[in-house]
Amino acid sequence: MASSLTCTGVIWALLSFLSAATSCVGFFMPYWLWGSQLGKPVSFGTFRRCSYPVHDESRQMMVMVEECGRYASFQGIPSTEWRICTIVTGLGCGLLLLVALTALMGCCVSELISRTVGRVAGGIQFLGGLLIGAGCALYPLGWDSEEVRQTCGYISGQFDLGKCEIGWAYYCTGAGAAAAMLLCTWMACFSGKKQKHYPY
């Protein structure tokens, strides 16, 4: 099977896939922020949440429903900052996935990734990582929303966790973006083989 990638390019393709997968898994999982409410663990992502309070009519009290899900609508996301974070991080993950899948195809298809295409792919990865990094930086701005304050002991604010903790998915998303920006972008410059020029 012919490949359009150098040895460095094959490593770049695998690392691109790993960094994209890491960022995408972290983005999708609702474990960016951990807290508790009514004695039950609660976690948030950018567009998903685990455990939420509902009013139990039979007992006339608030109870926690312990399940994960998306917000009912885009407007249901607790803060404008988290809505922007969802869009920006989602775009970044999409770009990283696009480049990763193209790079993996370059392992099997000859003359798909030239040096120029590799450099352009590296630029796209840098942009994707930058967008995800911007999303991660925006996320703490939403910690002053009412839903988060209920979970974090009513003492959280922008860039102030209160009684909450940052979850593994936040770190996972950021680590994937950092790997894409720092390692993959650099390796992409050396990923493609020099194009052969045919005399005809």
Curated annotation (Swiss-Prot):
Its main location: membrane. It is found in: Membrane. Belongs to the LHFP family. Residues 1-23 form the signal peptide. It is a multi-pass membrane protein. Keywords: Membrane, Signal, Transmembrane, Transmembrane helix. One of its GO terms (cellular component) is membrane. Disulfide bonds: none annotated. The chain crosses the membrane at residues 84-104, 123-143, 166-186. Gene3D superfamilies: 1.20.140.150. InterPro entries: LHFPL (IPR019372). The lineage of its organism: Eukaryota, Metazoa, Chordata, Craniata, Vertebrata. This is LHFPL tetraspan subfamily member 6 protein.
